[in-house]
């Protein structure tokens, strides 16, 4: 409702987690299950963090020292936080600002683009291609330029991208 009101389109949330649905007339027509950060949540902050940590420790992203210094963590502490402590999704998503800060690094930019392309392939491809795609959430807003680029490259029409649904919900419910 915040993105399309009573219209039609594919509404997406890209924040700590991710979700999408085809909506029409303010109602959900279809939803591809997000499956959470272990099995899904493509395009989310948790996915960006997971892919960053993977890329850094497997040597695909050349920012290991910068990352460890910025977060005051060791490899062992990261593994412990992900596998032994609660809210691993939030922990992984907390690395999104680092990702954003290093977006000019070609390997980071490629990783973010791949993360968004994965979201499109695994989620958006399940909906009719003629529908406009709009996104809400901190990740969507922070990476808006690259998100638009990746979705347009995939053949999607991209509408509104915003950090918060508040303005759209006020408009929907109060007509303002």
Feature locations, PLM:
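Phosphate-binding/catalytic loop of phosphoryl-transfer enzymes
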Residues: 1-66
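ATP-binding/phosphotransfer module of carbohydrate and carboxylate kinases, centering on a glycine-rich
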Residues: 4-10, 53-176
């Amino acid at each position: 409702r915040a993105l399309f009101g009573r219209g039609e389109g594919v509404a997406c949330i890209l924040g700590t987690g991710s979700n999408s649905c085809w909506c029409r007339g303010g109602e959900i027509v279809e939803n591809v299950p997000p499956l959470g950060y272990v099995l899904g949540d493509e395009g989310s902050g948790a996915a960006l963090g997971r892919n960053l940590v993977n890329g850094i420790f497997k040597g695909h992203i050349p920012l290991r020292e910068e990352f460890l210094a910025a977060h005051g963590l060791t490899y062992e502490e990261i593994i412990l936080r992900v596998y032994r402590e609660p809210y691993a999704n939030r922990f992984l998503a907390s690395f999104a600002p680092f990702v954003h800060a290093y977006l000019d690094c070609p390997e980071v930019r490629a990783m973010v683009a791949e993360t968004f392309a994965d979201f499109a392939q695994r989620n958006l491809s399940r909906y009719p291609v003629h529908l406009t795609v709009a996104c809400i959430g901190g990740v969507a807003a922070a990476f808006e330029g690259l998100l638009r680029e990746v979705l347009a490259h995939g053949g999607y029409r991209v509408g509104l991208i915003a950090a918060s649904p508040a303005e759209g919900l006020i408009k929907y419910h109060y007509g303002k």
